[in-house]
Structures are given as C-alpha cells and as structure tokens.
Regions:
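C-terminal motif of bacterial Sec signal peptides marking the signal peptidase cleavage site
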Residues: 15-16
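Sec-dependent signal peptide recognition
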Residues: 2-7
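Short, surface-exposed ligand-recognition loops at beta-strand->loop->(often short) alpha-helix junctions
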Residues: 36-48, 123
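Hydrophobic residues embedded in beta-strands of well-ordered beta-sheets
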Residues: 76-77
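An amphipathic, aromatic/His-enriched active-site/gating alpha helix that lines ligand/cofactor pockets
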Residues: 58-65, 81-144
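Short beta-strand
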Residues: 67-71
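Active-site-flanking beta-strand signature of metal-NTP-handling nucleotidyl enzymes
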Residues: 28-37
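A beta-strand edge to alpha-helix "cap/lid" segment located at domain peripheries
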Residues: 19-20, 136-140, 147-157
Length: 158
C-alpha cells in the first residue's frame, strides 16, 4: 500500500515537468486519504458519486489544485492537492457542520468510510490544530499522520 501511495504521489509531482512555463508552488500541501470501500455500492455508483464530489470541490475551492480518486482494491485512495495550508483549511471549514460541503461529506459515508489521512508538504502547526478541531467536530476517528516538507519543489502547468 505504501508503494502505491508513493508511486501515485511521485506521478502527481512530476506531471507538470514538461511545461515550458511551469508555476512553482512552494508551500503545496498534499493530503492522501485512505477510504474503505462500501462493497454494497457498484463501481458505477461510486464513479458517479466521486465525480460529483470532485466537481463540487472544483467549483467551490479555487485554491484546491487537484482532487483525484484512485482504485486500490478494497480501498479508494483520494489525493487532494492544495496551494498552501490555508487552502486546506478552507476544505476543513467546508466539511464542518456549518460548511457548504457538510451534507455531501455525510452522503459520502454511504460509499466509503475514512481509514487514514496522511498530510505532507508545506504546512505548520496551524493546519495540524485546525484539522484536529475539525476531526472532533465531524466525528472522524481515523488517524491523521503529518510529514512536513524538508526541501524540494512542486510545479503546476499554469
């Protein structure tokens, strides 16, 4: 599973390298979410729901750079990319009980359950604290693991 996650992450990070005018994203935050698939839902139902969820995020969170779901057998891997930790905090606010995505988040639990959240990149204690507070509000019990950036770069095609 770790090999799959790191392979997916590597592919995302190098995907913008062929552009002549890439835009650097020095404080990008990447969140890798392991979701446990509800076996009662068909592949087509899952595809339609995740597409709707992705489109909603795309239309409401301008600093969310990517939101992709990946098939991992009994699990689904969701990779979220953010311009910075503030963009990730917008997502946390949106899934909170008063947020614009709270109902959609609750609906998502018909399709999968949360297994683990891994956060990597340019974040500070501010994001860790905000995620902890949000997890308590929403009732997440899955572990959150954090790996801060040491050095490197990320580019976008725009």
């Amino acid at each position: 599973m770790k090999k799959l996650i790191f392979t997916l992450l590597f592919a995302i990070l190098i995907s913008g390298c062929n552009n002549l005018n890439p835009k650097e994203i020095p404080n990008e935050v990447i969140v890798i979410v392991e979701l446990i698939r509800n076996k009662e839902k068909s592949q087509e139902e899952l595809r339609q729901f995740t597409k709707r969820y992705s489109n909603y995020v795309k239309s409401t969170e301008s600093n969310t750079l990517g939101w992709t779901y990946h098939d991992a057998g009994d699990k689904i891997i969701l990779i979220e990319r953010y311009k910075n930790e503030d963009a990730n905090i917008v997502t946390a606010k949106n899934i909170s009980p008063a947020g614009n995505r709270y109902k959609l988040l609750q609906e998502s639990f018909n399709y999968y359950t949360l297994g683990k959240v891994t956060v990597i990149g340019g974040f500070t204690q501010k994001l860790i604290d905000f995620n902890k507070m949000t997890a308590e509000k929403v009732g997440f019990t899955a572990p959150f693991v954090y790996y801060p950036l040491i050095s490197g770069f990320s580019k976008n095609l725009r």
